[in-house]
C-alpha cells in the first residue's frame, strides 16, 4: 500500500509540473503552420499545461535561436523540416527532439530524436490510383541510388497488385529529360517519389509538360504539384502529423528516451486533385472521390 501511495504521489507530481516545448520551424509556410496547430492542440485537448516557445528560421538568426533554447532548456524540441532538423542535430542535440516533415530523416537526425516520416506506404498510393481510374495499369517512375529502397518497395507492390512498372535509374541529372521522355511514352501513370536529386524546379516542369503531352497522369508529392499540373497528389495530413508528434512528445515528458521510441509513418492521408488536368487526360473522377479530396484545382479555369 505504501509503495502504491508513493508511486501515485510521484505521478501526480510529474503530471502537475509544467512541461515546456521549443518549436523550430524551417519556414513559415502553411504546412508547417498546420503541423504546429496539430502539435499544440494535442496538449490542449488533454488539458495539459505546456509552455511553448516558437522559432522560424525564415526570419530568426540561427545563433539567436540556439542561444535562447539553451537558456530556456525545454523538455523537448519539436522540429519541422530538414533545415530545422539539421540545426537541432548540430547545435542542440543534447535536448530530446521530435521531428516531422523531413524528407530524409537518416541524413539529419540523431539518437536523441524521434518523429514522424513523410513516407506514405506505397500500397496506399497504388490503391488510391486504382480508385481514381482503374484503367491506370502501367506505372512509370525515376529513381536514383538514394531512392533505391523506395523503388524496390514500389516494384514489389506493383507485382502484388498486377501493375506493370517501367522504371529508370538516374545517375546524372543531365539524363533526366531523356529519361522522362522515354518513360512517359510507354506508361499511363507516373509516380513521383521523394528524391531531391531527381525532382527540382526544371525537372518537375519538364515532367508535368511531358505528362500532358503524352496523356500520362502524374502523381505528385503534395498539393503544390497538383496546382502546378499533376493529376493528383497523395499527401500527409499536416495537422495530424503535428498531433502524432505531440503523442511522442508526451511520452518524452513522461521520461522515455527518444532512442526507445520508434520513428512512425503518417496515420492520416489526404489527396488533392486537378480537374482541368483530369479532363485533358480523359479521366472522369467519381463524384465521391471529388468530395473526399482535401483540395481541388483547375475548376473554372
Residue ranges and their predicted role:
Residues 2-11:
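Bacterial N-terminal signal peptides
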Amino acid at each position: 500500500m505504501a509503495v502504491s501511495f508513493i508511486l501515485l504521489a510521484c505521478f501526480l507530481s510529474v503530471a502537475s509540473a509544467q512541461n515546456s516545448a521549443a518549436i523550430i520551424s524551417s519556414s513559415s509556410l502553411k504546412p508547417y503552420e498546420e503541423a504546429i496547430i496539430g502539435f499544440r492542440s494535442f496538449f490542449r485537448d488533454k488539458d495539459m499545461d505546456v509552455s511553448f516557445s516558437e522559432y522560424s528560421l525564415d526570419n530568426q538568426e540561427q545563433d539567436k535561436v540556439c542561444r535562447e533554447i539553451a537558456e530556456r532548456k525545454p523538455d523537448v524540441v519539436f522540429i519541422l523540416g530538414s533545415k530545422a532538423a539539421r540545426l537541432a542535430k548540430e547545435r542542440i542535440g543534447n535536448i530530446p527532439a521530435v521531428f516531422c516533415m523531413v524528407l530524409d530523416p537518416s541524413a539529419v537526425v540523431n539518437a536523441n530524436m524521434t518523429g514522424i516520416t513523410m513516407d506514405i506506404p506505397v500500397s496506399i498510393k497504388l490503391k488510391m490510383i486504382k480508385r481514381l481510374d482503374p484503367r491506370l495499369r502501367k506505372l512509370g517512375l525515376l529513381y536514383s541510388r538514394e531512392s533505391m529502397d523506395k523503388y524496390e518497395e514500389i516494384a514489389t507492390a506493383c507485382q502484388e497488385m498486377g501493375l506493370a512498372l517501367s522504371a529508370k535509374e538516374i545517375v546524372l541529372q543531365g539524363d533526366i529529360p531523356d529519361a522522362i521522355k522515354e518513360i512517359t511514352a510507354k506508361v499511363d501513370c507516373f509516380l513521383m517519389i521523394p528524391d531531391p536529386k531527381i525532382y527540382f524546379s526544371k525537372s518537375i516542369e519538364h515532367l508535368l509538360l511531358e505528362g500532358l503531352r503524352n496523356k500520362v497522369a502524374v502523381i505528385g508529392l503534395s498539393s503544390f504539384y497538383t496546382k502546378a499540373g499533376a493529376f493528383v497528389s497523395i499527401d500527409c495530413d499536416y495537422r495530424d502529423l503535428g498531433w502524432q508528434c505531440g503523442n511522442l512528445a508526451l511520452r518524452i515528458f513522461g521520461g522515455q528516451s527518444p532512442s526507445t521510441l520508434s520513428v512512425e509513418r503518417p496515420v492520416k492521408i489526404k489527396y488533392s486533385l486537378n480537374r482541368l488536368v483530369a479532363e485533358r487526360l480523359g479521366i472522369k473522377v467519381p463524384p465521391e472521390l471529388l468530395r473526399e479530396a482535401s483540395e481541388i484545382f483547375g475548376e473554372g479555369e
